[in-house]
From Swiss-Prot:
Molecular function via GO: ATP binding; DNA binding; zinc ion binding
Lineage: Bacteria, Bacillati, Cyanobacteriota, Cyanophyceae, Oscillatoriophycideae
Keyword entries, A-Z: ATP-binding, DNA-binding, Metal-binding, Nucleotide-binding, Repressor, Transcription, Transcription regulation, Zinc, Zinc-finger
Polar residues bias: start-end ranges: 171-180
Gene behind this protein: nrdR
Cofactor(s), names only, from the UniProt record: Zn(2+)
Naturally occurring in which organism (per UniProt): Gloeothece citriformis (strain PCC 7424) (Cyanothece sp. (strain PCC 7424))
Name of this chain's protein: Transcriptional repressor NrdR
Region feature Disordered, mapped onto this chain: 148-180
Residue intervals of the ATP-cone domain: 49-139
Top-level taxon in the UniProt lineage: Bacteria
GO annotation terms (biological process): negative regulation of DNA-templated transcription
Zinc finger (unnamed): 3-34
PROSITE patterns, A to Z: ATP_CONE
InterPro entries listed in its UniProt record: ATP-cone_dom (IPR005144), NrdR-like_N (IPR055173), RNR_NrdR-like (IPR003796)
UniProt cofactor note: Binds 1 zinc ion.
Amino acid sequence: MECPYCQNTSSRVLESRSTEAGQSIRRRRECLQCKHRFTTYERIEFVPISVLKKDKSKESFDRSKLLRGIVRACEKTEVSAQQIENVVEEIEARLQQSPRREITSQEIGQLVLQYLRELNEVAYIRFASVYGEFKGITDFVETLNQLQQEERESSSSPEWSDAGEEATVIEDSSQVMASS
């Protein structure tokens, strides 16, 4: 590794640690000639993944695009930046581990929804509203009702059933309009 200060190629590694969920290695080095210390990163070079979009065009997988979409969905929620980064890393790792080098944007969207559903319901609905291309309030209400139904089925908390405070499922969009 070439020293960024004196360009000498001899250095010694002082410390190494895994970063980015094991996807890279951070090394702290010291130049043997000028004694300056510097940090280097070793990253795995992945085979590029192509994303097949709805309009049948292809583009290279763009991690920053995935991150932006998830950040936008998680705005003003309790989801931390670290949690968002973890989701992006996990999705990217799953894509890289797949033997397929071409994936549809719909498949990526489904992966994001799986993670957001566990992380935060508001972020899930926000992402679903863009990804699912809701045509109107009816689509939105149907997704909310589905979430609510699944939550009821998975909830076995005695406090919930004893409290009698079960939320009302909205049956049609006219009720939403009237209550607004």
